[in-house]
Every structure is written in C-alpha cells, then in structure tokens.
A protein has these predicted regions:
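Polyanion-engaging groove/track-forming segments
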Residues: 4-5, 9-219, 225
C-alpha cells in the first residue's frame, strides 16, 4: 500500500501526470526520518581521540550515502567512501570528514541533550538550504520543516519542565514522538490520480477504483446502502 511502499514508487512512474494524496503519510517512512536516525546513530558512536573526535565508519558511510548528503556533491561523497573502504578505517576523524560546510556541520560532536537538539536543528537547516532539483524537492523541504518544528517543540517542553536528561533519554523521546507523526496532505485540487485511505472512499464516485489493500471486514459500505 501507499504507506509501506512510500511515495517514491509514485514519482518513478513516468506515465502518471497529476497525483493527489489525501491521506496522511507516516513520517517514519520518509527519507527525512531516516536521515535523522542516521544522525542519531552517528552521535551515539562518536569517540574522543586526543584533541578531536572520531566517528564509526559504518555510520559515516550511511551519512555519505544518504540522498540528502550524496546529492550535494556526489563525486566528493563517493570518493570519501571509497577511501574509507580502501584504507579499512574503523574510526574516521571528524577533521578529515569536514570537506565542506555541510559535512563540517554534520560531523561535529553533540554530547548533552541540548547540544543534540541544536545539532539537529542546525543540520536540518543546512540540508534544507541545499539547491536540490527534482520532483521531490518541495516534499523534502516540507518533511524537514516538520521535523525541525517537532524538535523545537520538544526542546521547549523539556525546558519548561526544567529537568536534566541523559542524551539517551532525549533520543528515545524524540524517536517515539517522530514515529507517531503523519504528514498532512491538503488533498486539493481533485484531479489526476487520487491516493486515498480506505475510509475516505465512502463518499466518492469514481469511474475506476483500484483497491491496493484492505483488512477483512473493514471495507466501508457503499454510499447508497
């Protein structure tokens, strides 16, 4: 269905013109959420080394391969990843990783929970400013904006409580909150292919309806019954 397959399959279809989504899309299944997860894992496995910091090679590879980063400079990120693999590096120095402003911001340490909050907001803002092209550029910025808004709300709520949290607790709260969110779509104008939740179909009258999935006994009754 749309939730499990994501909007990517829709965008890949060259024969589809206008697509109108009227159902909310789970944030946890978006590229924006996977990017946040990779940032979290990157910080979880950071290590202090001398006067600097290192990051675990698998986390670094995940960041460099993520579309939000790779599309900024495909040649640079691919070259960096190939060098890490060739040299069989386990830990990668932050100083070596900071090849441009975006990478410097991403590969910087964030220890306590307030630093993590500021780090997330800074990286999200930097990524959103990148000159992306393609059909999903607007969607990308909108998803990142939703995450930034929720990170800010969580920060404000915790500040009001005036409590100290371990970074692990903050990360758990952030994850649980983001995983429950759905991106609302306006559902207008009514043209092209309509992608809808099953309950939304009760009051519509289309010539062709394709039912992708539905649990037994949950199909809504016809409008005339």
């Amino acid at each position: 269905d749309v939730e499990s397959r994501g909007l990517g399959d829709v965008y890949k279809r060259q024969d589809i013109g206008r697509v109108n989504v009227t159902m909310g899309f789970p944030l946890r299944q978006s590229l924006a959420y996977t990017f946040v997860e990779r940032l979290v894992e990157l910080q979880n496995h950071r290590r202090k080394k001398g006067g600097g910091w290192t990051f675990y090679h698998a986390d670094v590879a995940g960041i460099l391969a993520h579309p939000y980063v790779a599309e900024c400079d495909a040649v640079l990120t691919r070259t960096m990843h190939e060098e890490i693999v060739r040299d069989r590096r386990i830990s990668v120095d932050a100083a070596w990783l900071g090849r441009n402003e975006l990478l410097k911001r991403i590969f910087s340490p964030a220890a306590e929970w307030r630093e993590l909050s500021d780090y997330m907001l800074g990286v999200i803002a930097a990524v959103a400013r990148q000159p992306y092209e393609g059909d999903d550029a607007k969607q990308r910025v909108e998803f990142l904006a939703v995450i930034a808004e929720q990170v800010t709300k969580l920060r404000n709520s915790l500040d009001e409580c005036d409590i100290e949290l371990a970074p692990e607790v903050y990360i758990s709260l952030l994850r649980r909150h983001l995983q429950t969110l759905r991106i609302p779509f306006e559902g207008e104008p009514l043209e092209g292919i309509q992608i809808m939740g099953i309950l939304e179909t009760r009051n519509v009258d289309f010539e062709n309806v394709i039912l992708l999935s539905c649990l037994l006994y949950t199909s809504p009754s016809p409008r005339d019954s």
